A protein has these predicted regions:
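Surface-exposed cleft-lining segments at the edges of enzyme active sites
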Residues: 126, 188-199, 225-227
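Glycine-rich, positively charged active-site loop/lid region within alpha/beta enzyme cores that binds
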Residues: 171-195
């Protein structure tokens, strides 16, 4: 089923953030629970990066979708209230940041329900889901349907939104090329050969991909993390890039939920 774009629009653009804070580091390696230096990278996202992100979006008059683990929402309620107060959408991103492929069906259900409850305490209905690690189990879509979710943003098999035929869940495809993590993620406990990319280089990559998707009438799903994109040089790059996107009158800049409703 094709996207029903607003009049005069030829493609869609979604600004999304995975507000993982410390949870992504705990999921990567449980031993990180005893490594405050490692965890502080996630804390930066909550304490500094998110504020810079929200200020940038407010300055540009843009709305975004924040996919947030439930445990992060519980740990940082003030930040969650600010996200909601500014009119942004909340999306489900697990309770912890554990891949569904590592869970039994009962454990995955518990993650789904606890995460949903943690987000909805901030007064907003949560209908969108993004899997931690962009991976799903054989049970994921059955559970999403059973518990009132309307869309997923976890798969990489298209540049246009589509309906999962067996479940009637809208998929808003993602791709690593439009994620900030491959360019900016770095940990001293990981691969020291990984190179941190310059913000200028990443903007060039994102511009080229956006231009290509726009020409094909697709969805550009930009995926970022406050702890990575929220560094001073990168937030300046993000403002430049979003200003460039806004300069194209035929681009529909919307939240993930708005795009999903245009498909279903």
């Amino acid at each position: 089923m094709p996207m029903k774009l607003p009049a005069g629009k030829t493609c869609a653009f979604v600004i999304s953030f995975d507000f993982d804070a410390e949870e992504v580091w705990l999921a990567e390696n449980p031993e990180n629970a005893d490594r405050p230096g490692v965890l502080s990278q996630g804390s930066y996202g909550a304490k500094v990066g998110l504020g810079l992100v929200l200020d940038t979006l407010d300055h540009l008059g843009l709305q975004a979708t924040f996919f947030t683990p439930g445990r992060v929402a519980e740990r940082y309620p003030e930040q969650m209230r600010e996200i909601v107060a500014l009119g942004h959408e909340l999306g489900h991103h697990g309770y912890t940041h554990t891949s569904p492929t590592k869970l039994t069906k009962a454990e995955e259900l518990e993650e789904l329900l606890k995460g949903k409850a943690a987000l909805e305490q901030f007064g907003t209905q949560v209908t969108g889901y993004r899997s931690p690690s962009w991976e799903v189990s054989p049970n994921t879509f059955d559970l999403l349907v059973a518990h009132g979710f309307h869309y997923s943003s976890s798969m990489m098999d298209d540049i246009k939104p589509y309906l999962h035929p067996a479940h009637k869940i809208v998929e808003l495809p993602v791709q690593w090329i439009l994620d900030d993590a491959p360019y900016f993620w770095f940990s001293s406990g990981g691969d020291w050969n990984r190179t941190i990319r310059s913000a200028k280089d990443v903007q060039e990559i994102w511009r080229e991909e956006f231009i290509g998707i726009r020409a094909l009438g697709g969805l550009t799903m930009l995926t970022m993390h406050p702890q990575f994109i929220g560094r001073p040089s990168r937030i300046a790059m993000l403002e430049e890039f979003l200003t460039f996107v806004k300069s194209h009158d035929d681009v529909w800049i919307a939240t993930a939920g708005e795009v999903a409703r245009a498909v279903k």
